[in-house]
From Swiss-Prot:
Residues 349-461, 462-574, 618-730, 774-886, 887-1003 form the CUB domain. This is Tolloid-like protein 1. It is linked to Atrial septal defect 6: A congenital heart malformation characterized by incomplete closure of the wall between the atria resulting in blood flow from the left to the right atria. Glycans are attached at N169, N359, N390, N626. It is found in: Secreted. Residues 1-30 form the signal peptide. Residues 31-147 form a propeptide. Disulfide bonds join C190-C346, C210-C232, C212-C213, C349-C375, C402-C424, C462-C488, C515-C537, C578-C590, C586-C599, C601-C614, C618-C644, C671-C693, C734-C745, C741-C754, C756-C769, C774-C800, C827-C849, C887-C917, C944-C966. GO terms for molecular function: calcium ion binding; metalloendopeptidase activity; serine-type endopeptidase activity; zinc ion binding. Pfam families: Astacin, CUB, FXa_inhibition.
Amino acid sequence: MGLGTLSPRMLVWLVASGIVFYGELWVCAGLDYDYTFDGNEEDKTETIDYKDPCKAAVFWGDIALDDEDLNIFQIDRTIDLTQNPFGNLGHTTGGLGDHAMSKKRGALYQLIDRIRRIGFGLEQNNTVKGKVPLQFSGQNEKNRVPRAATSRTERIWPGGVIPYVIGGNFTGSQRAMFKQAMRHWEKHTCVTFIERSDEESYIVFTYRPCGCCSYVGRRGNGPQAISIGKNCDKFGIVVHELGHVIGFWHEHTRPDRDNHVTIIRENIQPGQEYNFLKMEPGEVNSLGERYDFDSIMHYARNTFSRGMFLDTILPSRDDNGIRPAIGQRTRLSKGDIAQARKLYRCPACGETLQESNGNLSSPGFPNGYPSYTHCIWRVSVTPGEKIVLNFTTMDLYKSSLCWYDYIEVRDGYWRKSPLLGRFCGDKLPEVLTSTDSRMWIEFRSSSNWVGKGFAAVYEAICGGEIRKNEGQIQSPNYPDDYRPMKECVWKITVSESYHVGLTFQSFEIERHDNCAYDYLEVRDGTSENSPLIGRFCGYDKPEDIRSTSNTLWMKFVSDGTVNKAGFAANFFKEEDECAKPDRGGCEQRCLNTLGSYQCACEPGYELGPDRRSCEAACGGLLTKLNGTITTPGWPKEYPPNKNCVWQVVAPTQYRISVKFEFFELEGNEVCKYDYVEIWSGLSSESKLHGKFCGAEVPEVITSQFNNMRIEFKSDNTVSKKGFKAHFFSDKDECSKDNGGCQHECVNTMGSYMCQCRNGFVLHDNKHDCKEAECEQKIHSPSGLITSPNWPDKYPSRKECTWEISATPGHRIKLAFSEFEIEQHQECAYDHLEVFDGETEKSPILGRLCGNKIPDPLVATGNKMFVRFVSDASVQRKGFQATHSTECGGRLKAESKPRDLYSHAQFGDNNYPGQVDCEWLLVSERGSRLELSFQTFEVEEEADCGYDYVELFDGLDSTAVGLGRFCGSGPPEEIYSIGDSVLIHFHTDDTINKKGFHIRYKSIRYPDTTHTKK
């Protein structure tokens, strides 16, 4: 039995011909694209109980079945699903690079192979765990025919209309890109995506653990997820996932694929072979479409390859001897478009019009239209705009009620939208205006009468009066750049006794301090004279807006120069539930929010299960000198929707410290969901020490005063183990008379200590400071050096030196923030000297004096020597400089091995993000280079597209490549052919790892092999 049953085009979900196999299935880009999910991040669209493709009763590779599907498709559930190896696959991050999962998938492949053989009747007498084998109706292959009697048309989206919801986790730019992908499908097919209102079945864009995942076709009976996980938010990938939603399978699983491509099985990653199984001819219908190499639903040549340069799918050569390209993720192919139009039975005549203006006409205009013609035009402009349709010619057969030949215009996105008019004859209709941003125009002819036909023009107009309780407003041409010289005015009115709520999904308008050029203006009322709420521009989303009445006035203006992506906003009717007599049913406190409200409790109480009443809670007032604080339910997972506030108070002149023993909260970069906040003071207006989440244990935190506020919040989704923390109070001796210290007093637990400013050392009495010796050796990757006695004038007759060393492979940089040394043309008196090496005999980088801040100085290697000299006469303020490191540079290789590290803080911290470093290793002429990786840990990706180390056998990147590396485990030794090697280290802005350590040397090596065997 084939792994999935369906048609070409990655194979269409063939309900069109009445053939449905397996029901709902999911395709995960953790398998399709090699993208994986972090595991700690969750989509926040949790109020929607959607069908999650990451959870299923049975998994066959990237195919998921639940109990309903097993019944619908007459599959006997004879395997114990609580024990079978399919069960856990849906709860991983995609499985790539996971050795245990690869082994499990290897076993899975064997089981799938057995299922296929059972389906062909080859093991009719075998059983699984003493049960009847897994069977499919029509088990004997020669009896296998399309099951027209069980046609499942509900898997096609009715009318080609797909309602959608975008989860709250996504940024404005991501939302815009999702809409661009949907408009791309709309432009070329008759499929329509609409924002969901009250439709029962719809899709939800989410961020789920299965990476890029989607069901194939319409699931029905409620919402279904389309997961756009980590690294999946690319236009082509979203178009691909929407292809699955519409009804497409992967092209390379067509029954006839062996006539067009060759599967090179020895190059496939172990355990991933099942991704290359094909469907059976009796189980699918290709709808007459040819194999499409260019399909956006086709795997690339190296998908699931053991190496990025090894092919797993090799396309056959065409008539010109050229192998077609496969695996593009740029746009729909002609085959994709043709297949979708067949699947959804799009009329051959008509199109989707998305420009701000355009025209349409009957076929053959003005030379007459054919009989029995059916055309549909869908006009779709930016939400917040209206469509004005003007007929310029009308010459159709006239009949009673326009029964035969007619044009219908509807105010909306499909054939059931409100009718604006039905027209025939030769009388021009009045100008028609839509109430929203979509219009449906349908033309039918059934007579043999010959007339010119019709012609019409349309134009999108922005602004106008909007009288409804909810909707969307976007800048003209959103999500593309808005047009120049536009002025749009919207007057929004909702039901009486309500307010207008306005929230922004994305916002990008030309920036100016006073918003003088392009801007959005919002006023609290019905006109430009109403009170101003705000004039907005720039890239920060405005705060949510709530009018004081049931009206809101908005104006968008663009000038003739810079154009940006614009804005997208939702408006809705809003009421203040807390102003009602029962305060929303809240027992203690009612907090009104835009579009809703929530109950809250006083400190020491928490909301009960009904979310309205209050009960004794976590938190409270703590006056002990020490104690322990834990999250509710410790050591089990903390419950959702908790808000705990601890107020810790100590005696006067004491300070409170908190040390976490264990810490694990739901993680997010901005700690938006579950978090702990620690304040110096008892209110949320005090000094905030930090907001913490994730699994990294915070440092010890000490209050500024004798009280501290600790607040824990959890949302309604993911729960973790929580935290356990100890607090303790200590007397702050420094708070009185500086602890007797001459310079600085530092409080410590149970005691205190004195410190001296730069250039001084602590006296034996541990309180006073005396002038320090002026020789320092510095080994830290960054820090501060100053002239003696800084910030006061430096003393006379002083000589100070600094020997600065950094990590091998990194150059030292010295940058001055202040500089004032006695001026002399040749710096003969007081001066600062900087040397490119470890001693004053090294090449000099500069001899400095005067009042001008010098340019930064960069050494060629990882050592720098700095010397300051003052004479007996004039003294000045001196200098202050920071030393840091820069990666890259030219390094000389010798016969003695040398080291090179990925980053200056190797061993202490992971490498930073957004780095591009190049090292040029050069040996003596006639010698070669040997490179040996001592440590290697770089973010893993199949094509090494995110973080990587790339080597070239020469002076620059045009030389022969020695390899691009990522992942864990050091590569084998590398030998150059020439006397130089260029090393390029690149990192993106997300996952950071330990990095690498290379040991290199110059050798005499006659062999020309690059890699040691």
